């Protein structure tokens, strides 16, 4: 199974690459829109700034290519990659996300330390991922998604309850605010479920 890891000037590509390879798949890091056509799944990773990432996706033509692939192969957004699935972000109001889901990204509450960094639990709402309910995953973020659509699959508590997993199984699209590739065996298992389970 060929998994395209989208390169758009953000961090954590190596850890995602290693995780995909560990799962027995063929990872390909690319910023070439045409290469996404040959992939069996696409991962939009990321740690960084919403504006810089959105601009790079637009400049390279990756935005249009990713939108064209929606529903044909599994798409997973991780951390900033999940936030880019939304229409916009308070971090950079003038920048446009992919608009896969309606809604925006907002800052975490002022009364908690940011970034939210470290291990935290996820309460899953869906039977699809029930075996992972209450498990610990690794987070690093200062913003969180605020979707208008009914796409929340899991929530986490950090000053408030926020969506930590979103998705639309019918369109093969998922987003995770945490880093499954840095979350030990449980995270790797969840990553594998999304990459292969969504394509079944």
From Swiss-Prot:
One GO-annotated biological process of the protein: L-histidine biosynthetic process
Q: What is its EC number?
A: 4.3.2.10, 3.5.1.2
Q: Where in the cell is it found?
A: Cytoplasm
Pathway membership: Amino-acid biosynthesis; L-histidine biosynthesis; L-histidine from 5-phospho-alpha-D-ribose 1-diphosphate: step 5/9
A Pfam family: GATase
UniProt-listed InterPro entries = Class_I_gatase-like (IPR029062), GATASE (IPR017926), Imidazole-glycPsynth_HisH (IPR010139)
**Annotated catalytic residues:** 79 (nucleophile), 179, 181
Q: Does the keyword Cytoplasm apply?
A: yes
Q: Which Gene3D superfamilies match?
A: 3.40.50.880
The UniProt entry, under PROSITE patterns, shows: GATASE_TYPE_1 (PS51273)
Q: Where is the Glutamine amidotransferase type-1 domain?
A: 2-200
Which GO terms fall under molecular function for this chain's record? glutaminase activity; imidazoleglycerol-phosphate synthase activity; lyase activity
Q: What does this protein do?
A: IGPS catalyzes the conversion of PRFAR and glutamine to IGP, AICAR and glutamate. The HisH subunit catalyzes the hydrolysis of glutamine to glutamate and ammonia as part of the synthesis of IGP and AICAR. The resulting ammonia molecule is channeled to the active site of HisF.
The record ties this protein, via NCBIfam families, to:
IMP_synth_hisH
Indicate what this protein is called per its UniProt record: Imidazole glycerol phosphate synthase subunit HisH
